[in-house]
Amino acid sequence: GNGWYNESTLDNWDWTVDNFGTGSFGTGPGNDITIGGNYIYTETSGAGSNKTATVNSLCVNTTNLTTPNIRFSYHMFGATMGTLELLVDDVVVWSQSGNLGDQWLTAQIPLPSDSNVLIQFRGLTGTSFTSDMALDELVVDDGIPAGCTDTLAANYSPTASVDDGSCTYVLGCTDSTANN
C-alpha cells in the first residue's frame, strides 16, 4: 500500500513495520520521528551477523520534478550497529555505519532527473542484537534547500533549510569550536 516492499530473493532478512520500540534494550528507536506513527526497522535479535535486509520502492518517476531528491529519517542506535545504504538504480549513493546515538537523523540525497528510478535501502546487520536500524518519513520531492545553516560559519547560507554538513569556520576547519 505504501509503495515499498521487502526484497525476497537477494537478501536474507526483512524490514518490519513498528511503532513503539524494537523490543531490544540498548538499540533501535523508542518511537517514530513524529511520535505516534510507524517506521520500518531491521530486528537483529536472532539474525546473526552480516545479514542483509533490502526494502525496494516501486519505480519512481522524477520527470515532473525540477531538483528531485529523496529525504528520509534514519535511526542507528546500538553498540554493534551495522551499515545502512541507499541505492539508486543499484548504485550505492549514500552510506552510514556504526552507532550514531539514540536519535533520529535526516538525510537528503539528489536523484537523477527525467527518469524512472528504483530506490533501495539496504541494511547490513552488525555482530549482535544491538544493531536495530530504522527508517521513517521517506519522501521523494523537489527537496528542501540544503547548505550551511550555522550563522557563525564562514559559508552560512541564509536560504538553506537543511544543514548538509558543509559548514566551514576558521581556515577551512569544520569544527565550530576551533580557535585557530
Q: What residue ranges belong to the model's regions?
A:
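Extracellular acidic, Ser/Thr/Pro-rich low-complexity tracts
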Residues: 32, 76-78
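Short, surface-exposed beta-strand/strand-loop-strand elements in extracellular ectodomains
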Residues: 83-90
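Extracellular glycan-recognition surfaces and repeat-rich motifs
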Residues: 1-45
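Extracellular carbohydrate recognition
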Residues: 48-54, 125-143
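Extracellular carbohydrate recognition and processing domains
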Residues: 90-114
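Short beta-strands within extracellular/lumenal beta-sheet-rich domains
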Residues: 38-39, 44-69, 105-106
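Extracellular calcium-associated, cysteine-rich motifs in secreted modular proteins
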Residues: 144-180
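Extracellular beta-strand-rich recognition modules
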Residues: 55-76, 84, 116-125
